[in-house]
């Protein structure tokens, strides 16, 4: 399987311009394509300005094609969908018009393409596009437009006019602190809070009382007492008639005990809980993940695009998460006398970081900075600093960490950050991937052999572990300048086995290691053998690589964390979570046996407060839970009376998902796009782009798998998944009103998985037949009709739930109108067949 770094290396070698744009024959002309593709992504006036016409003309053309009423997008929506806008126009507009459409300047576009999570590589080579201008349609084009409208009406009818959710509507939902009414008509005098000295505890207690009032109409009677007990490990909750007493040694532990009470009340749909005493001790900490909707750019400089609103932080905390991470770039966070060009805007960023840390702490959540440092610089940076110039990669050069002045800068910059914000939870680093950083970071056979430092005159003579140990110690010393307790965690992504032992032996024992749990687990699907080399939920960890690295960390006196994905992976990231909690809990049980001490629970995808996370939460504490009972309780909490059917559906989905043909090229296969990916009778001539453009590159999609096996496995997985949908439909129908919306969204997520899996099987078979000469045209027509049916079935799901098709670093893979376009595309293909 082509992993992330290998894919980026391949894409870096490809030309970035000069390729022919892909034409779309299902549109009468490029003007119609522009209006259609941007209808729900760009406001009318901006579209008109790009075309050189009036807003009225744009609206009339959209209506003539059968498009639904034009919406007005807010500034917040626009800042959250720019990747989708760029993608939709990559094969349509020249650079100047694309800049105008975004409302940016050319410098910002080029910076975004380069720095925004390798966006230029995801999009692929830049096509040559002629400007799109407003023109009067010919008689033939008007006739074709009328035909489009007829097809749209026939396929979607009144469904197309339903407003559904707004783009990125999930931001408002996750930012909403209100609790749904679960049950009314409960008598009682209400709940009260005993006086609390600690202000944070008092606010936590008031939030608990608000939850009871809103969830149960103010019913029930009780008095809540919150007590901090110095030296106490874990928490103790005592429930008696008319009172609840919660004791803990730390504020965060006490908050988790309160969240457990809320879970139990939601499960029982009652503010009155059975009497008893519950004692818990934390076994995994920290447990941190990324925001579901953070913008990848510079969130600390743009607080209006808040990646962690208060209500979202509370929802994550209720799901057992006690840490969140965001990227920090050292040369933007700290000034430097040695490098006066660094640190511009750092005061603003640190002020905003301090406020985020304060707000997160209100919910028992700590903030971690992801460091990929020191960032490589252009050659001009080293004109007066030749002694610092390290290995080269893609026209940039490392700030060589064998130079003591560079390490001093790293240390002092982190010291500046942690003195300014000592309450930070800590940092975690990636040192062998992503951006070019230390001289070894792109040094050859990644993850397999010991890296080399290439053309660095100093590091080329050194072992990688010696240079990295110096860098890691500088980082640790910088953190300790401001905090004695902040975590210093090193992520082993890309570390070769030979490097691990010597490196860890040189590190201080107060640093920690995080290892990808499922990495290198052997797997056989459809008769094809492979091993995990990316994130996976369908393959359950831990694997031999992680257990070796954890053992090496223990031998060096360090504690360890597991890097996991409990919500989703690139197996399918078009949904906020894959509803397979049985697999998640199997992973948790394995990790408990392995003795890990903390979790990194998500990379950029996977930050949604889901039923998967709620189920995993039971394993974060002692005593160890029972998996079956955990699933029943979470299902009752989320589905109410329909819980048994929900558990049965999850079991069906979990058993189906282990058929995923792991080892396919998950970065390019159209599992993220499903039925929105257009069919092509004629080869496009374009290689797939990472995540964003699968195109028609079927052989690339399949990786080492024969296409027939990929086709068969996706079809098998979809067929096995389908019975779970009927079970989940019953569970939703039985859910009480206060739980029905969340239950219905989970059904929409499950349907999306089914539609995407089946569509991938269709597309692989279609292109397999195309490559064989398109002689079996009856079967190809069947596949095209199946794709049309899947697009129609997915449309109301995507329209109703704004989470569908969205991922934080890629924005929307598709919008509802892309599914309507797929029907037009398929009708055109049928004409050719």
Residue ranges and their predicted role:
Residues 21-181:
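Long, charge-rich, low-complexity intrinsically disordered regions
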């Amino acid at each position: 399987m082509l992993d992330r770094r290998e894919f980026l290396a391949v894409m870096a070698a490809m030309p970035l311009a000069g390729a022919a744009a892909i034409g779309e024959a299902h549109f009468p002309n490029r003007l119609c394509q522009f209006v259609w593709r941007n209808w729900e992504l760009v406001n009318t006036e901006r579209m008109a300005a790009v075309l050189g016409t009036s807003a009225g003309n744009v609206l009339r053309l959209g209506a003539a094609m059968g498009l639904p009423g034009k919406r007005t997008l807010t500034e917040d929506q626009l800042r959250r969908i720019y990747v989708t806008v760029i993608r939709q126009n990559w094969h349509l507009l020249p650079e100047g018009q694309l800049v105008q459409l975004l409302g940016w300047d050319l410098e910002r576009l080029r910076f975004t393409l380069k720095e925004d999570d390798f966006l230029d590589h995801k999009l692929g080579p830049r096509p040559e596009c002629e400007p799109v201008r407003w023109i009067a349609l010919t008689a033939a084009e008007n006739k074709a437009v009328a035909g489009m409208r007829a097809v749209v009406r026939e396929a979607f009818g009144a469904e197309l006019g339903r407003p559904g959710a707004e783009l990125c509507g999930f931001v408002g939902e996750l930012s909403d602190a209100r609790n749904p009414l679960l049950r009314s008509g409960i008598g009682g005098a209400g709940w009260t809070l005993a006086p609390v000295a600690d202000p944070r505890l008092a606010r936590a207690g008031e939030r608990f009382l608000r939850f009871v009032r809103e969830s149960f109409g103010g019913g029930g009677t009780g008095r809540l007492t919150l007590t901090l007990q110095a030296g106490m490990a874990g928490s103790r909750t005592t429930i008696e008639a008319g009172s609840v007493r919660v004791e803990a040694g730390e504020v965060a532990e006490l908050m988790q005990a309160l969240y457990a009470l809320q879970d139990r009340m939601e499960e029982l749909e009652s503010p009155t809980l059975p009497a008893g005493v519950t004692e818990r001790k934390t076994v995994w900490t920290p447990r941190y993940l990324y925001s579901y909707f953070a913008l990848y750019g510079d969130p600390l400089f743009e607080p209006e695009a808040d990646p962690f609103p208060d209500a979202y932080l509370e929802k994550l905390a209720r799901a057992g998460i006690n840490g969140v991470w965001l990227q920090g770039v050292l040369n933007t966070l700290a000034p430097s006398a040695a490098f006066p060009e660094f640190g511009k805007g750092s005061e603003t960023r640190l002020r905003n970081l301090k406020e985020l840390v304060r707000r997160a702490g209100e919910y028992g959540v700590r903030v971690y900075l992801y460091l990929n440092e020191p960032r490589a610089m252009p050659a001009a940076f080293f004109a007066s600093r030749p002694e610092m110039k390290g290995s080269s990669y893609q026209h940039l050069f490392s700030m060589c960490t064998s130079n003591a002045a560079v390490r001093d800068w790293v240390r002092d910059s982190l010291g500046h950050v942690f003195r300014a914000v000592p309450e930070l939870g800590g940092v975690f680093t990636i040192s062998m991937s992503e951006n070019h950083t230390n001289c070894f970071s792109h040094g050859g056979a990644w993850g397999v052999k010991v890296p080399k430092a290439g053309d660095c005159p100093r590091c080329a003579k050194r072992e990688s572990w010696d240079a990295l140990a110096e860098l890691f110690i500088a980082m640790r010393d910088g953190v300790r300048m401001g905090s004695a307790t902040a975590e210093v965690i090193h992520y082993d992504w890309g570390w070769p086995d030979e490097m691990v032992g010597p490196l860890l032996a040189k590190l201080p024992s107060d640093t920690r290691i995080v290892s990808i749990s499922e990495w290198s687990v052997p797997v056989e699907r459809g008769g094809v053998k492979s091993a995990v080399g990316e994130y996976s939920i369908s393959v359950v960890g831990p694997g031999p690589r992680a257990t070796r690295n954890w053992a090496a960390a223990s031998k060096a006196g360090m504690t360890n964390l597991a890097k996991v994905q409990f919500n989703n992976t690139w197996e399918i990231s078009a949904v906020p979570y894959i509803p397979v909690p049985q697999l998640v809990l199997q992973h948790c049980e394995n990790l408990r046996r392995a003795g890990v001490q903390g979790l990194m629970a998500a990379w950029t995808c996977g930050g949604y407060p889901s039923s998967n996370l709620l189920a995993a939460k039971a394993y974060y504490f002692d005593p160890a839970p029972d998996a079956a009972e955990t699933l029943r309780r979470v299902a009752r909490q989320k589905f109410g009376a329909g819980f048994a059917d929900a558990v049965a559906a999850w079991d069906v989905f979990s058993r189906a998902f282990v058929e995923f043909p792991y080892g396919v090229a998950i970065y390019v296969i159209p599992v993220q796009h499903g039925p929105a990916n257009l069919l092509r009778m004629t080869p496009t001539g374009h290689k797939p782009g990472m995540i964003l453009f699968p195109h028609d590159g079927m052989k690339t999609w399949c990786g080492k798998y024969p296409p027939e096996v990929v086709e068969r496995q996706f079809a098998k997985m979809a067929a096995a998944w389908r019975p779970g949908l009927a079970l989940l439909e019953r569970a939703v129908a039985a859910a009480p009103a206060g739980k029905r919306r969340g239950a219905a969204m989970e059904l929409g997520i499950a349907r999306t998985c089914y539609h995407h899996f089946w569509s991938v099987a269709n597309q692989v078979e279609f292109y397999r037949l195309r490559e064989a000469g398109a002689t079996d045209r009856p079967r190809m027509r069947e596949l095209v009709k199946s794709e049309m049916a899947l697009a129609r079935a997915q449309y109301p799901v995507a329209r109703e739930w704004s989470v569908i098709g969205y991922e934080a670093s890629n924005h929307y893979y598709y919008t509802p109108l892309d599914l309507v376009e797929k029907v037009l595309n398929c009708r055109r293909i049928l004409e050719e067949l």
